Amino acid sequence: MNFPWDQLLVKGNWMITMAQIGAPFLVIGLIAVITYFKLWKYLYKEWFTSVDHKKIGLMYLICAVLMFVRGGIDALLLRTQLTIPDNTFLESNHYNEIFSTHGVIMIIFMAMPFVFGLWNVVVPLQIGARDVAFPVMNNISFWLFFVGMILFNLSFIIGGSPAAGWTNYAPLAGEFSPGPGVNYYLVAIQISGIGTLMTGINFFVTILRCKTPTMKFMQMPMFTVTTFITTLIVILAFPVFTVVLALMTFDRVFGTAFFTVADGGMPMLWANFFWVWGHPEVYIVILPAFGIYSEIIPTFARKRLFGHQSMVWATAGIAFLSFLVWVHHFFTMGNGALINSFFSISTMLIGVPTGVKLFNWLLTLYKGRITFESPMLFSLAFIPNFLLGGVTGVMLAMASADYQYHNTYFLVAHFHYTLVTGVVFACLAGLIFWYPKMMGYKLNEKLNAWCFWLFMIGFNVCFLPQFILGLDGMPRRLYTYMPSDGWWLLNVISTIGALLMAVGFLFLVVSIVYSHIKAPREATGDNWDGLGRTLEWSTASAIPPKYNFAITPDWNDYDTFVDMKEHGRHYLDNHNYKDIHMPNNTHTGVIMGIFMLLGGFFLIFETVIPAAICLVGILGSLVYQSFVQDHGYHIPASEVAENEARLREARIKEREAVGHES
């Protein structure tokens, strides 16, 4: 089968042409830098093939930040186009491509890897584990995500981006979208989604089987609890999306008719399958974000989390209801009054467990000795802003009223008030909060504060006017409008807000660079002035030792670590060290990733035979891995004792230095 060379290059747009010219230079420059500093061996042995959950988490976070930049640039392009009426900055199809990629990147390739990165770094440390349950699978999962990310971003310069929206509805995404654009969507998300499913299974088993034996479920830190419940959503929801992506791939590549009315298919089948996955997907990123807030708020309020058990049950209730609300995304598609009523009520019910969480956070703050570090600022700003998103969500849940709001900018404002305040604020707060645990030093708090205030104010300036625009009738997915529509002023204000958000994010980037150069290094591990309340703060900072814990810690209550510090105890007071078994690195993830990248690329351009050859390579890699007799290695007890003695001495010196300064 011949390769469609005529579809390879995208023509006719100056931005794409610049990217096509610049991308090769960027890649060549990156390769040159790595080669000049002789980093290939180091990167391959210490990072690319690593099964250390902390390093894999950092790789996820780096990718997530890069995708935040890409998705943010997309958003600025959209806002620039809509700033003035009859704007010709973007033509219609390019606008459609950008808003399609913006949604996919922010949800699939920014929010999810951000969450997975924090899972990898924090969860095993919070439960007293030495690694995840399946370290090799963890490495493979990352490379599947990475390949999906690369393929999806490749569409901008090779073949053309998808232009059917992030929901990719049939039949628009079928016979009305020729070319490779939609194929990029289907294949890239399919590959990444398989990695996501593997991650969900891995962390589900990790929390069940690898936690310290004395830790009971109701005593787990809330971030771990929300992670565990989220993994259940991943395990139940992602197979649905995997199937529906495969069905549309078969429609487009092999000529089947699952979603084509003329041949007996049903376009609404896609909408139902998509949202059976799509709404739980919202909670796949929201629930861990709630867990992040539940760690930060008690830390800087210096109080135990109020209503810990009710928070656990509320999280479980939200997860259960998330599978019963998908039809609210298409109330206007003629479902009938009975069906709309059921899904309207189930949607409103989600407000009950969510309200429980909000009140628990507020009661945690009540009479707390609150300090306003930047993670706390993001957490406090989340509460009123997310509440506005929730209230407007209840408005949209009323099926009859939804006929007025549906597909207007009111809806756009609503889901940004839930996802940006619920997820993006949490990601930024979590990154700053656990940054010293990952890197051994805190980010500059003054620069972080600038980031917060500009980002939070810019967010409200950007999206509050969009509620009014929606009520005034401005449709979503609109690439231009006329002066007579009267939407110009509010769109200008909205664009100014988007620019403020971008400047705020730049302050975070400056903070990362500045702190890397100037910030003092810390060894105690309990980096926020000794306020840490969970086990990860008991270990060394800057990627703790590969084994995490020299001995298995005891955990008898939700606030065990706080009690230990108050009584002057440490989990290492017992010096009965033993040899520690650890897993070896793996090449399988990198090899599978290469086959996935090539096979996915050929499938996108419907070149089936090379894609099939790559599939054989993928299956061969898995078969080979299944026969590998790798029993790992042991860290001798003497080495553990020496390492822990060195860390203990560093902690003592650091505490003495702090004492002299105070």
UniProtKB/Swiss-Prot annotation:
Keywords: Cell membrane, Copper, Electron transport, Heme, Hydrogen ion transport, Ion transport, Iron, Membrane, Metal-binding, Oxidoreductase, Respiratory chain, Transmembrane, Transmembrane helix, Transport
Record Gene3D superfamilies: Cytochrome c oxidase-like, subunit I domain
Free-text cofactor note: Binds a copper B center.
MF (Gene Ontology): copper ion binding; cytochrome-c oxidase activity; heme binding; oxidoreductase activity, acting on diphenols and related substances as donors, oxygen as acceptor
Biological role: Catalyzes quinol oxidation with the concomitant reduction of oxygen to water.
Family designation: Belongs to the heme-copper respiratory oxidase family.
The protein's name in its UniProt record: Probable quinol oxidase subunit 1
